[in-house]
């Protein structure tokens, strides 16, 4: 019997549909990746949605996998890329010139002189951290390790400086941005997010979370930066406004602010006796370095705790806080494409004997400066450097889901902050 022509066999149709579905899936993942790296809301939305469906550990495994692929791609596509500078640094022998507040690079917003910010510290020696130079002399960009002043509105002398390091000899695109804050002239305050850290103390259930910079202080606020991990990522402690939102863990590293205006950082068990004198404290994982020594765990081949659930060797965006040896300078760091050991060594190079890692991942670490948006005079946020996610309303009019810190000039003659 002659064979009649028929429609394509089912296997062919299935193969075609599978190819279409595969292509659509790849396209969707690519679009999702672009969205996460473009919109500040996309990363948290995707991560939190996935955690509620497949669980925290599975999301962490997925993140490790995706970041691992990204690092392999970068190692191939950027292997001949030289370390990059983000702002101009005065040449050797040329007097240091005050830079203007704003995004990194040669531009940025002008430093408007607003009467709303106190003019502080004029009778004290000018603040300037000591240059540390590059971590790797043969693997650096011009100006690595040199402090560049940030001049903010209403303050005649720079109270904050910035520098850049390239801390990883195997990745030219690994970058460590550090801001130094003069704690003799600046107040740093801690604000709970609208949802994080989730409280685990009954006394904190009725705590009213403002989750943004109080309006009366927005006139003089200079900068703000991210806080720590979500409660489900380690249960690290937080205390502010006289309320313990999350019970501290003895082994956690903690940054303390005290009623006398001083700051300390270290393992919580060593600072527990100082809690009654604290205005606030915020914990994170074990100190990456303490008293000048790198944590032994960061030398191990497989470490998870410094990324909460992520592996310590995962190449991601990270943030950290530290103090100089005298406790007079607060350093805040934010990175691109670094492992936990690389971040820790970079902070030791800056001159910080004890280092506390804060939040990680693409969307969460951020440092923003605040300037007036001429001509309407509306305050807006500006990123420290290009490539960091933020919104104009960051910490101002938009409530933050996660906790954060903000920075004000100390008001001469006013009492220091007291916890209720």
Task: Please describe what each predicted stretch is.
Residues 1-15:
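N-terminal Lys/Arg-rich, disordered targeting/topogenic segments
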Residues 190-349, 353:
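Aspartyl protease catalytic domain
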Residues 16-246:
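Zymogen propeptides
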Residues 176-180, 254, 287, 320, ...:
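Conserved hydrophobic/aromatic beta-strand scaffold that supports enzyme active sites
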Residues 329-333, 338-394:
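C-terminal soluble interaction/assembly domains
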Residues 380-420:
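Low-complexity, Gly/Ser/Thr/Pro-rich intrinsically disordered linker/tail segments
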Residues 181-185, 257-262, 323-327, 369-373, ...:
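Short acidic-glycine loop/turn motifs at beta-strand connectors
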Residues 174, 250, 316, 398-402:
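Short, solvent-exposed loop/turn segments at the edges of secondary structure
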């Amino acid at each position: 019997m002659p064979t009649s022509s028929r429609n394509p066999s089912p296997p062919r149709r299935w193969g075609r549909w599978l190819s279409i579905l595969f292509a659509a899936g790849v396209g969707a993942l690519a679009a999702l990746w672009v969205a996460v790296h473009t919109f500040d809301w996309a990363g948290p939305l995707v991560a939190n949605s996935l955690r509620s469906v497949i669980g925290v550990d599975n999301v962490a495994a997925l993140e490790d996998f995706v970041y691992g692929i990204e690092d392999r791609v970068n190692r191939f596509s950027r292997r001949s890329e030289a370390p990059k500078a983000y702002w101009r640094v005065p040449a050797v022998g040329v007097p240091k010139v005050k830079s203007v507040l704003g995004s990194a690079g040669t531009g940025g917003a002008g430093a408007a002189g607003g009467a709303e910010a106190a003019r502080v510290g004029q009778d004290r020696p000018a603040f300037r951290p000591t240059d540390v130079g590059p971590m790797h002399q043969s693997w650096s960009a011009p100006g690595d390790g040199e402090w560049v002043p940030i001049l903010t509105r209403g303050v005649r002398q720079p109270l904050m400086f910035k520098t850049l390091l390239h801390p990883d000899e195997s990745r030219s695109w690994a970058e460590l941005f550090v801001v130094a804050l003069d704690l003799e002239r600046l107040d740093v305050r801690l604000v709970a997010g609208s949802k994080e850290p989730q409280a685990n103390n009954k006394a904190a259930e009725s705590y009213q979370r403002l989750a943004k910079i109080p309006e009366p202080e927005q006139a003089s606020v200079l900068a703000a930066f991210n806080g720590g991990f979500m409660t489900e990522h380690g249960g690290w402690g937080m205390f502010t406004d006289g309320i313990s939102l999350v019970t501290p863990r003895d082994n956690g590293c903690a940054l303390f602010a005290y009623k006398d205006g001083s700051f300390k950082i270290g393992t919580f068990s060593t600072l527990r006796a100082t809690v009654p004198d604290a205005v606030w404290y915020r914990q994170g994982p074990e100190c990456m370095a303490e008293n000048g020594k790198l944590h032994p765990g960061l030398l191990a081949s497989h470490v998870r705790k410094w990324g909460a659930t992520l592996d310590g060797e995962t190449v991601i965006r990270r943030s950290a806080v530290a103090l100089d040896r005298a406790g007079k300078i607060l350093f805040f760091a934010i990175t691109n494409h670094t492992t936990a050991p690389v971040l820790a060594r970079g902070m030791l190079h800056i001159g910080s004997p004890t280092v506390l890692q804060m939040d990680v991942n693409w969307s969460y670490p951020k440092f923003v400066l605040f300037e007036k948006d001429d001509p309407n005079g509306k305050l807006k946020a500006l990123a420290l450097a290009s490539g960091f996610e933020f919104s104009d309303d960051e910490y101002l009019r938009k409530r933050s889901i996660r906790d954060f810190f903000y920075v004000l000039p100390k008001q001469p003659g006013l009492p220091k902050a007291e916890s209720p």
